[in-house]
């Protein structure tokens, strides 16, 4: 849901989308770029953040709370008033005026951590609300118009019960996966 929203924003603003999926091995070179050989010469292979900055796209920083400090340090100057990237061994580049960055994250997943205040302050935080019975009803009616009322009510009830237990830390957030539930229902349909 979060990444689809980010990609749709890029589409609405008619800007290219550059996706970065953070994981424990993502480093600053992956974001800015690394040296490579082209025709027996060392050239910069531009990273995702570099390309986004250069062409004015939407940088979608997926699971930003899994990023190592090395990777996050690249984002500080990029996201603050300087709006620039220092490319070691090359030049400093200024961000295209249309360049935007959207960080997405899930709380409580393995390998995630709290974001530091300096990074969070560079974003406008949008907390995606939990699903309500009404929103689930809308989704299920659109995706499964032929499902029996009783079955739809039960599926919604199971999801809401799991969501409540996850919110109260009675269970992990892992079982709470609307995408997975919808995929399972498509198989049964």
Set out the residue ranges of the language-model regions:
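AAA+ P-loop NTPase catalytic core and its hallmark functional loops
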Residues: 1-168
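C-terminal helical "lid" subdomain and adjoining coupling/linker elements of P-loop NTPases
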Residues: 165-189
